[in-house]
Amino acid sequence: MALINNVNFTRFSRFGVNLGRLTYTAATHEEATDGTDELKITCDEDLTKGERLVWLDRQGVVHEHIVDEIERLHDADGKPYTSVTCINSINETWDDYIEDKRPSGSAAVALASILAGTRWEVGNCDQPGGASHTFYHISVREGLSDLLKTWGGELETVIETDG
């Protein structure tokens, strides 16, 4: 777990409207090999479930997290504050549905097939070999897991910004 200092978080509504910078009092980011990627923030502002927080880490990597859990609390003096847990934005694909897709060939071809209709696109996909798989009545996120089991490799998200 990494404590985050001097990082600017930009808030976006679930519809992509820029809500400005988030002023926070504490922030931690946890990313692990088991797929955990959580951002925990304490702030005075009211956040809404589904809002997106975009930020740049010390290595120059852009991250996007979705506000998932919100707690409105009070400190010892009765002053209200907000504690939120945010998850990696790839988790939005739990809400995207695959009716019936049967890609075959490279992992890049299969990935493009299951990401069709989402805001995500295939970036660098260098997994060698070919395979085929049926993705039937599952979420895109489940499809990504199935793809990794069938074609191998690891999933990494890259967020590109325009400013």
What is each residue range found by the language model?
Residues P80-Y81, T85-G163:
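Charged- and aromatic-enriched interaction segments used to assemble
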Residues M1-K101, S145-L155:
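Assembly/oligomerization scaffold segments
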